[in-house]
Regions:
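Short, low-complexity disordered leader/linker segments with a strong preference
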Residues: 15-23
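Bacterial N-terminal signal peptides
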Residues: 5-16
Length: 364
């Protein structure tokens, strides 16, 4: 079995500002260790193939949800669907895929239907405490977030396709990237997004607007602070009520209270250019939620940070196509056992699982 263990971050590669500390030297202190599971997930049924995997989530049953882009398969990948068929394999899988812990596909659905506007480019998925499934999109016309039951029944749409009115508008979105629902208040936090530069909050039941803010808790575009870049790529709640927001292009994680009060920020791999270093984050599931995991699709690492101060402890993964390597790692999620799941876009087109192997000295 191929093993990918957490690798210690190099000094200076990932520095934190505004309340965070510098990275540890290789081998300093304990950190979580991981081993890639090359057999997860199982092959899809029905001759299906996964396209770009643009979101991944774990629900309260420890099932893993992937939103993928069927239209990103090339002709040779979907050769069985051509007329006449080019090859024996394959056909695009439905956009929304639910896997059990063994990696078996247990449910699939998605696509355009009555009463809602399915995104042109799928992007981001979250499953809330009531088993509702939320999705977004990032095409130039995708300015909506959709809510479904786990069976795929449509429930709610926030925003409208092809309608966006900027950061000050409270009824429209701007290419929303991802979302998170607070089980304590049933509020929906949206990372908005690829066009807008803010976090916006709605009632998850009614879709009523609650509040929004930009970088440092200021109004979007406030010249007194460094604004969020595009995209604002994630918004992730911890159990203590802190909200972690991915300012991807600026290589930083900003931390807020749920009311938008700015707390601190962490900068990860500050020299990173291109697509930036902070694509998605999730927290560990130990009682204090000690660790913060950061998917870095430009450097193709998953960084492990101490959640209280942003200090980088370790990383795993590198650019490549083998099990445990990444090409444009786009999202991640953590299950109740501490296992980490990742999703890759561009030509990566896969989901992977990394088994949690306890906390110990990290390996170089």
């Amino acid at each position: 079995m191929i093993r990918i263990f957490a690798l210690a971050a190099l000094v200076g590669l990932a520095l934190g500002f505004a309340g965070s500390a510098t990275a540890q030297r290789p081998g300093d202190g304990p950190g979580p260790r991981f081993e890639v599971d090359p057999w997860w997930p199982k092959p899809l049924p029905s001759n299906w193939l996964m396209g770009q995997a643009a979101g991944i989530a774990v629900d309260r049953h420890d099932h893993i949800w992937v939103i993928q882009r069927p239209r990103t398969l090339t002709e040779d990948e979907r050769g069985a669907t051509l007329n006449p068929p080019r090859s024996l394999c394959c056909a695009p899988a439905p956009p929304v895929l639910e896997f059990d812990q063994d990696g078996v596909l247990v449910r699939s659905w998605g696509g355009q239907g009555a009463g809602y506007e399915w995104p042109l480019i799928e992007h981001g998925i979250f499953v809330d405490h009531q088993d509702n499934v939320w999705i977004g999109g990032n095409d130039a016309k995708d300015h909506q977030v959709l809510k479904f039951t786990r069976e795929g029944k449509f429930l709610l749409q926030i925003g409208k396709a092809d309608q966006t009115r900027g950061d000050a508008d409270t009824a429209h979105l701007g290419r929303p990237a991802n979302m998170n629902v607070d089980p304590a208040t049933n509020e929906l936090f949206i990372a908005d997004g690829y066009k807008n530069h803010r976090v916006i909050v709605f009632d998850a039941q009614t879709g009523a607007y609650k509040r929004h803010w930009g970088a440092n808790g200021r109004p979007p575009g406030d010249p007194s602070v460094k604004s969020f870049g595009n995209p604002v790529h994630c918004a992730r709640l911890a159990k203590d009520g802190l909200l972690y927001v991915c300012d991807r292009a600026n290589n930083r994680i900003q931390v807020f209270k749920k009311d938008g009060t700015f707390v601190k920020e962490f900068v990860v791999a500050p020299a990173t250019r291109g697509g930036g270093s902070v694509w998605d984050v999730d927290v560990s599931h130990d009682a204090p939620q000690t660790w913060l995991y950061n998917a870095d699709g430009e450097n193709n690492h998953v960084w492990t940070l101490l959640r209280d101060n942003g200090q980088v402890v370790s990383k795993f993964g590198r650019n490549g196509r083998q099990a445990g390597q990444f090409h444009w790692v786009h999202n991640l999620a953590v299950d109740s056992k501490g296992n980490v799941y990742t999703a890759e876009v561009d030509t990566g087109k896969r989901a992977q699982r990394f088994l949690f192997k306890g906390v110990g000295p990290v390996e170089n």
